[in-house]
Structure formats: C-alpha cells, structure tokens
C-alpha cells in the first residue's frame, strides 16, 4: 500500500499545478513561488518519469506478491457489473481496496454520519454534466439528443430491467426509472419522489437526479452495514498508471490500462468506443478520456475536484452546471405508483426533458474565476507567527 500511495503522490507532484512553464498564479505575494514551494521553476518531464517508474515498481511487486486485483463480475449482466463495482468501493475485505478510511464500525441508531442528513436537503446532488459523462452500456459516449430521440436516456421504455448506460451510472446516480424500494423511482415533476424538488431547485432532487453511491436508498438502508470510505483502489492505480504512460509518450499502453477498468463493468475499449477520435495520436483527447474515466469510476472518492485543480482546469470551474427537468409526456400527470391501481393508467414510458442552468446553488467561480483559488489561503494569524510559513500566491 505504501508503494501505491507513492504513485498517487507523484501523480500530483508531476501535474500542471506545480509542474508547468509558468506558476499557476502570478499575483502577489510571490514568496512561495520564488522559494519553489508551489512551483518547480519550470516544466520538468523527469517528474512524470518518476511517477511512471513508481507505477512500474508497484505492478512488478504486485505480480510477485499477488493479493490485490480488480473485483470482477460473476456474470455479464448489468446487475453483475454493478455488484462488482459496488463490492469494490463499498464493501470491506475486498481484493481491490488498498487504503481506506474507517471511522466507526457499523451504522446504528446513535452513529449516523452527518453527511447522510445533508442528502435530503440537496447535498451531493449530481448534475446533468456528471450524468452525461457516463457512456452507453456498449461503451460509446452518451449523446443527449440521440437518447431523447431513441427514448433510452436511462432505460428502454423506462424499464429498470433494460438499462442502456454504463452500470456505474446506476450505482452512482439515482436516475428516473431506476429500481427503488422494489419499484421504479419517479423523478419526473410531480412524481412520487419529486413533487416539486426539481421545479423549485431545492431538496434531494433539485437537479432532477439523486445521489446513490454510498447513500443507497437512504440511511435506513445502511443500518448495520460496515462503513468503508476508499482512499485508494486498484482501479485508480490502473488510471494513475495510464496517465503516467501517456505523459511518457506511451499511449497504446495507457489505453490498455484504462480498458482494464472499463472491462470490469462490461464496457468496450476506448478506441472501439471512440472511433471519431485519434486517441493514439491526440494526447489531449486521450487525457480527456482518462479524466472522464476517473470521474465515472471514482465519483465521491475525493478525486474529481483535485483532478480539476492539479490540471489547472479553469475551463471546468468556469462552466455553469445544469439540471434536468423531467416531465411526463404520455398524457398523464403526477405520481403513477402512488395512485390506486384502477386510476394509474399505463406505466409511464415517455418523457419530456428540459435542461436548465442551476441558479439556486450557482457557484461564484462560474464568473471571474481566479487562479489563486487552486490553493486556499493559510490563516493570516498562522502566517504571522513567523516560523517560516509563507502565504499561497494571490492571498
């Protein structure tokens, strides 16, 4: 596990935030820049070589000693792939978990995690942009307009037994029509779970989606389960290795590492799934695919936010995020499952989808983004103690 942590640290050390031709922030104070505490003074490709070497040493040691490996599905169904992914991130004592955080033993009546109470009030609500990152079940990139036209946004005919997307989507985001308490969850406006949450941009389904990863069907569904917060899994090791290979001009091997992670959930390889892209020759395109794979595989595992920072992705910080307003388009209205059987009518299978810019929880950095925000400020009182701590640039 120490070798795996070394790889993760060297990935950050080699990334653009610290390792670039220019410092990430040129505003005063610049003492930390001049002292090379937040910038190496230039781009150093040898740092990517060091990361690659650490990855190679890790996998060589793994080949000799064994034990750690990706959790694999026991079948080729969406449920089997979901079960493998669930075991990898959620259950203790699996072959994939390298480093984890454990605070308490099990959920019980007096040991609720406070984060679980934030979810019903809109905490951790997924966005449209995140939903769109998950590919189709075949591996091809998701196309919103095509999904609307084919009526297969999440399932065929809103049947949770016929999923159309990456199995990790359903294990990460609660989407309309997903199986929930033995029935289809109703996230359309007026639905059983979503009376007005999306239309008012408040509550658990403010964006038209709900959180599923770690939260499952609510705190009650987690009772008496062991708690597991993964910090580093084998899937991330393959993706770290892929990035290091790419930065050392080995795109073919990089793609092979990513494909190992995708194959675990039944997705085709990157090249087959992205025939409109030249992934072997376009390093920027391949880097985007690696970052997307990290977002889909490692959601809510403290990865995406720091990926955006270490790669200085001001473009992503400045991009306004959206939700998805879902309405029934079958002539019916309101909840279906909550009505008496003789008044339900046909099961809803057609919907109208309206994208909307999030306004109730808009972020300050969508406008006037400042690169100083990549690293937070140290408290002034701490800097003024005079023991050598220097303030980060721009603060």
Q: Which functions belong to the PLM regions below?
A:
Residues 190-233, 394:
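Active-site beta-strand/loop architecture of penicillin-binding DD-peptidases
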Residues 24-25, 187, 253, 272, ...:
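Residue-level signal for alpha-helical context at structural boundaries
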Residues 64, 137, 180, 188, ...:
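Intrinsically disordered, low-complexity segments enriched in small/polar residues
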Residues 178-182, 267-271, 296-300:
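Intrinsically disordered or highly flexible coil/loop and linker segments, enriched in small
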Residues 32, 41, 73-136, 224, ...:
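Long, intrinsically disordered, low-complexity segments
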Residues 3, 10-195, 318-330:
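An aromatic- and glycine-enriched ligand-binding surface/loop that stacks and positions planar moieties
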Residues 1-19, 44-59, 99-101, 161, ...:
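Extended, hydrophobic/aromatic-rich amphipathic alpha-helical segments that build helical scaffolds
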């Amino acid at each position: 596990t120490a070798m795996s942590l070394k790889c993760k640290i060297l990935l950050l050390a080699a990334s653009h935030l610290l390792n670039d031709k220019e410092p990430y922030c040129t505003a005063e104070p610049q003492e930390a820049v001049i002292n090379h505490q937040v910038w190496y003074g230039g781009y150093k490709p040898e740092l990517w070589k060091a990361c690659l070497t650490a990855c190679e040493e890790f996998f060589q040691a793994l080949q000799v000693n064994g034990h750690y490996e990706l959790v694999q599905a026991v079948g080729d169904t969406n449920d089997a792939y979901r079960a493998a992914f669930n075991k990898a991130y959620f259950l203790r004592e699996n072959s994939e978990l390298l480093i984890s955080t454990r605070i308490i033993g099990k959920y019980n009546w007096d040991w609720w995690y406070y984060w679980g109470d934030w979810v019903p009030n809109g905490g951790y609500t997924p966005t449209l942009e995140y939903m769109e990152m998950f590919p189709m079940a075949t591996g091809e990139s998701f196309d919103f307009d095509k999904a609307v036209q084919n009526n297969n946004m999440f399932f065929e005919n809103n049947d949770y037994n016929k999923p159309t997307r990456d199995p990790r989507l359903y294990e990460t985001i609660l989407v309309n029509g997903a199986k929930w308490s033995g029935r289809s969850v109703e996230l359309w406006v007026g639905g059983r779970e979503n009376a007005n949450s999306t239309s008012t941009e408040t509550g658990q389904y403010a964006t038209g989606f709900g959180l599923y990863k770690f939260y499952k069907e609510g705190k009650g569904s987690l009772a008496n389960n062991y708690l597991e917060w993964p910090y580093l899994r084998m899937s991330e090791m393959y993706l770290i290795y892929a990035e290091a290979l790419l930065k050392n001009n080995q795109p073919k091997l990089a793609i092979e590492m990513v494909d190992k992670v995708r194959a675990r959930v039944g997705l085709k390889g990157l090249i087959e799934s992205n025939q409109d892209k030249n992934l072997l020759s376009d390093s920027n395109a391949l880097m985007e695919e690696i970052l997307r794979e990290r977002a889909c595989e490692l959601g809510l595992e403290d990865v995406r936010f720091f990926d955006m920072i270490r790669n200085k992705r001001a473009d992503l910080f400045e991009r306004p995020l959206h939700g998805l307003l879902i309405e029934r388009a079958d002539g019916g209205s309101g909840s279906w499952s909550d009505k008496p059987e003789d008044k339900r009518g046909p099961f809803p299978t057609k919907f109208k989808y309206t994208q909307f810019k999030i306004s109730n929880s808009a972020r300050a950095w969508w406008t006037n983004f400042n690169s100083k925000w990549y690293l937070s400020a140290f408290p002034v009182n701490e800097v003024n103690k005079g023991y050598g701590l220097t303030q980060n640039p721009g603060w």
